[in-house]
UniProtKB/Swiss-Prot annotation:
It comes from Acinetobacter baylyi (strain ATCC 33305 / BD413 / ADP1). The gene is glyA. This is Serine hydroxymethyltransferase. InterPro entries: PyrdxlP-dep_Trfase, PyrdxlP-dep_Trfase_major, PyrdxlP-dep_Trfase_small, Ser_HO-MeTrfase, Ser_HO-MeTrfase-like, Ser_HO-MeTrfase_PLP_BS, SHMT-like_dom. It is found in: Cytoplasm. It comes from the Bacteria. Homodimer. Its EC number is 2.1.2.1.
Length: 417
């Protein structure tokens, strides 16, 4: 049997790093748009004895015995996901968003088929056809981008490319785009060329669940998402679809056995918890505040002379262009990190710098809103960001801002204990 010994006693080296990360999360302001803080209930499910159980297959059709309780858990997660997003089909087994996306490709395409997706350089995701990713290596990837005048998706270009290249599938969705996506326009374009429409709503799933952002679920053929980010659950994936028996069968077999073996039952349980949390009345107020906070920060930074791609935001994030300031994203990331403000460097459209340097940073408000920040706090925060950037990383300015950050973090703890 196991020795009755704690992690800190058994592996102090590892425990020390975990404790340091705990302290970092409490003392730093998190503005990475893809990060959030999940609830103790989600973490309790994720850390449960379910991690011991193997359960290849689906509820009622397993390849292992002893699955009577995990069947109940997985079915609960499926039913909640369908109810939350108004879907006819849900697969809760994907380990992550990228695995969910790869299963969709496997289900709907053959190697070499043409895919039309958003360019990574313009706000798309690796799995939307980037050359370094399976989606750009296995398939013939054509990329669309933003209108250089507006900083918004150029739907006319999407339609032109679709007519020219006749893709088998069009991918809509993003990892760094701050406006409302016109899902129906994508649907119309897909129908015009006889393509599947696949939406990756990983970044806005929480907003969609709360009715704060338009839902693509009954418009697209297939929709995927992560379950963290705005959804505020465990780091995992989810596939949703409207009713189509043929596509549902293809998706089921693409996930298992096509793309994965045994599901992570502890993660599925944590997803079930986060879906239930997203059905609570206060969840909509949270998501509304996420958007208000992003808009408030954008307003302050614009007033301080900074450029935001597309001129503002309708969701939880925005891209701050630093080209005018002659500051790199890498520099801004480091300076703000020294002030206990965590962001990520990010390319801006037509960025002259490399992806390892970039000319911008991406800012998102899901985590600070979970923490309890309102518009007053994020306006102060945006001013502090401008102070650090204006100073070009001056040590005294960074020290002053860091002290303010530590004070506000103490006032708004992530986890009370």
């Amino acid at each position: 049997m196991f020795a009755n010994i704690s992690l800190s006693e058994f592996d102090p080296e590892l425990a020390k790093s975990i404790e340091a990360e705990d302290a970092r999360q409490e003392a730093h302001i998190e503005l990475i748009a893809s990060e959030n803080y999940c609830s103790p209930a989600v973490m309790e499910a994720q850390g449960s004895k379910l991690t011991n159980k193997y359960a290849e297959g689906y509820p009622g059709k397993r390849y292992y015995g002893g699955c009577e309780y995990v069947d109940v858990i997985e079915q609960l997660a499926i039913d909640r996901a369908k109810a939350l997003f108004g879907a006819d089909y849900a697969n809760v087994q994907p380990h992550a968003g990228s695995q969910a996306n790869s299963a969709v490709y496997l289900a709907l395409l053959n190697a070499g088929d043409t895919v039309l997706g958003m360019s990574l350089a313009h706000g798309g995701h690796l799995t939307h056809g980037a050359k370094v990713n399976f989606s750009g290596k296995t398939y013939n990837a054509v990329q669309y981008g933003l209108n250089p005048e507006t900083g918004e998706i150029d739907y006319d270009e999407v339609e032109r490319l679709a007519i020219e290249h006749k893709p088998r599938m069009i991918v809509a969705g993003f990892s760094a785009y701050s406006r409302i996506v016109d899902w129906q326009r994508f649907r119309d374009i897909a129908d015009k060329v006889g393509a599947y429409l696949f939406v990756d709503m990983a970044h806005v799933a929480g907003l969609v669940a709360a009715g704060v952002y338009p839902s693509p679920v009954q418009i697209a053929d297939v929709t995927t998402t992560t379950t963290h980010k705005t959804l505020r659950g465990p780091r995992s994936g989810l596939i949703l679809a409207k009713a189509n028996e043929e596509i549902e069968k293809k998706l089921q077999s693409a996930v298992f056995p096509g793309n994965q073996g045994g599901p992570l039952v502890h993660a599925i349980a944590a997803k079930a918890v986060c879906f239930k949390e997203a059905m609570a009345p206060e969840y909509k107020a949270y998501q509304q505040q996420v958007v208000k906070n992003a808009q408030a920060m954008a307003e302050v930074l614009i007033a301080r002379g900074y450029d935001i791609v597309s001129g503002g935001t309708d969701n939880h994030l925005f891209l701050l262009s630093l080209i005018k300031q002659d500051v790199t994203g890498k520099e801004a990331d480091a300076w703000l990190g020294n002030a206990n403000i965590t962001v990520n460097k990010n390319a801006v459209p037509n960025d002259p710098r490399s992806p390892f340097v970039t000319s911008g940073i991406r800012i998102g408000t899901p985590a600070v809103t979970t923490r309890g920040f309102g518009e007053a706090e994020v306006r102060d925060l945006a001013s502090w960001i401008a102070d650090v950037l204006d100073s070009k990383g001056d040590e005294k300015v960074i020290a002053d801002v860091k002290a303010k950050v530590e004070a506000v973090c103490a006032k708004f703890p992530v986890y009370e204990n």
